[in-house]
Amino acid sequence: MADHPAVPDDASGDDSGSGLPPEIEQLIARLTGGPVDPELAKAFKDMGIDRVDPAMVEMVAGQMQAMFSGPDEGPVNVTLATDTARKTVSQAGDSVVSEGARRQVAEAAHVAGLWLDEVTIFASAGTITHAWSRAEWVEGTMPAWRTLVEPVAQGVGAAIGGAMRAQIQQLGEGALPEGMLPAGADPAALLGQLEPMLERMSGSMFGLQVGQAVGALAAETVSGTEVGLPLVADRSVALLPANVEAFAEGLGIDLDQVRLYFAVREAARVRLFAEVPWIGPQLLAAVRDYAGAITIDTDRIETALQSVDPTDVEALQSALQGQLFRPEPSPGQRAALTRLETYLALVEGWVDVVADRATRGHLPQSDALGEAVRRRRATGGPAEKTFAGLVGLELRPRRLRDAANLWAALESAQGQEGRDRAWGHPDVAPTAADLDDPLGYVERAGGAGESEALDAAIDELLRGEAPGDGDGR
């Protein structure tokens, strides 16, 4: 190569013999895990990539380098998701939490714990409290988001790969547009070489979407687990002072009361997740069951991409958002969604009832605050809509009021102990059918208790003991 008197214009300084611009060749080599295959290079050249304006090549390469920089992180590029979420909250406005605000949150959490001790059998999960900025909430909850979203990302990636392979199997060289591939090229072999790049692209695009969704949620959520999911790993009570203040604006309620009310709700939710260890895995299992049946609507994707500049990564991501899922879920997915929504409703319904009992005698505006929370959930917001479009799941429980009625009825019949013991095992916890008939569930739960007492008495008699005298004396 050194003997050549000049570098051809279409080689853009390339000395590898591929004829591709060096920026593009280096990028393809890194994404495919080795030297660029000559057949693949020729396919790109036949598409005209070597004749693209150098400035455009540099811009596209820069975008791709940013998207694929760093190690392969699997189905979701969490580094990209975290960076995107932090940029989102920074653009919306975020500030460092003052020491005064941290003390106020710690004091509110302490008082909330004392009030909850009076109304639930679930013990405090600990004394750790956090007063988080929006960026700190992103950092603190991103590991849980990864665990939640990865099954969906895997399902999407597998469905996309399967759809592409199925289409290529139906195509021969003659079925592709003229000049798309070099003569004699095997489309399936080329796809095999591109699969590592497609997997990283899928992980990066999903990371970008997760980051935007979590960033939008960080601008609205008032506490660590307000969405009804166990997002905080250390079982701490976390509030976002800036978002609590934003919620309080226009309510005409003292900020101290608002802070205390949300501290009670968050502390109650943290106790529930700590004392009911099966609820978190059940939520995740429902997401996995949903994700395992994901199918890709390739026709909708093709329609969405027809008017998009393929070099514009953000436009590409925007076009795909909401287009990856078929309009109608499969029966298996509907069952998974029903389970997920039921558990979320049960969690938030229980929190509603317990928070009401804990604050009723202490906060003058307790009822007004409860109604404000219900209005906020009923109307929804951009965060809920963003995440629903991202993974096809509705994170806001649709049947919250039914769940709250069920817990209140159970408490009325059996007291707070009976209410809380209904969480003892997923097999005895209320179901979607029970939300349709709360009073029927309460009657059945009461009957089960009487039956257990009768069985215990009979067992004692068979052992020759007096009923109620467990030691036989």
Labelled PLM ranges:
Residues 229-245, 313-330:
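A short mid-domain helix/strand-loop element embedded in enzyme catalytic domains
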Residues 257-277, 407:
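Active-site recognition of the HExxH zinc-binding catalytic motif
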Residues 105-242:
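Auxiliary, metal-adjacent structural segments of Zn-dependent hydrolase domains
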Residues 116, 204-225, 273-325, 335-363:
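Post-HExxH zinc-binding segment in Zn-dependent metallohydrolases
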Residues 328-473:
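Pan-zinc metallopeptidase signature
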Residues 1-157, 415-473:
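N-terminal low-structure segments adjacent to metalloprotease catalytic domains
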Residues 202, 243-264:
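Short pre-active-site segment immediately N-terminal to the catalytic Zn-binding motif
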Residues 80, 85, 92, 99, ...:
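An N-terminal structural lobe/cap that precedes and organizes the functional/catalytic core
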